Amino acid sequence: MTDAHESTSPQRAAEVLAQRWQHAWNAHDMQSAGELLAPDADFVNVGGRWLRGRSEFVDYHVRLHEMQMRNSTWSDLALTVRELSADVALAHLEWQIEGDRDPDGRRREPRRGVFTWVLATDGHGAVIAAAHNTNHMPAPTPTPNPAPARAS
C-alpha cells in the first residue's frame, strides 16, 4: 500500500486517509473527501444508503453538509488495520461526530460509530475502494429465559 507520494505501510496509509477524511469533513469539503475514494468505490452510509461511485458520494455528501452536517465536527478515535494482500487492507476507524442535526433541524447528541474501509492501491496511492459506516447502538440488555415448565 502506498501514500500518494511515497511507499508506506498499510497502517500509515490508513492513518493518512483517516487524517485527510477528518480534515475534509471538518472543512465541509466533500470534494476533497471524495478524492479519498476510488472512482468506482462502494460507500454505504450509517443509514444504509448505498452510494455507487465517487460522484454519487460527493453529490450526496455536499447536500448533507449544506443541511444536517453544516456545523458538525468529526473526530477520529481509534484505527486498526489488517493487511489482506500487498495491495489491499482492511481498516476499522472508530469516530465521533458532534454538532449535527436531525432532518427536522433538532440538534443531535454527540454520537460514535465505526467505519469499515477496504483500502487498495490505485497506482497513485491508497484509496478507499469500499466503505461501510455505522452508528454505535446501545447493546440490548439480556433478559433471562424462564426455566421450562416441568411435566408432572
Q: Residue ranges of each PLM-predicted region?
A:
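Helix-loop segments that flank and shape redox-cofactor active sites
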Residues: 39
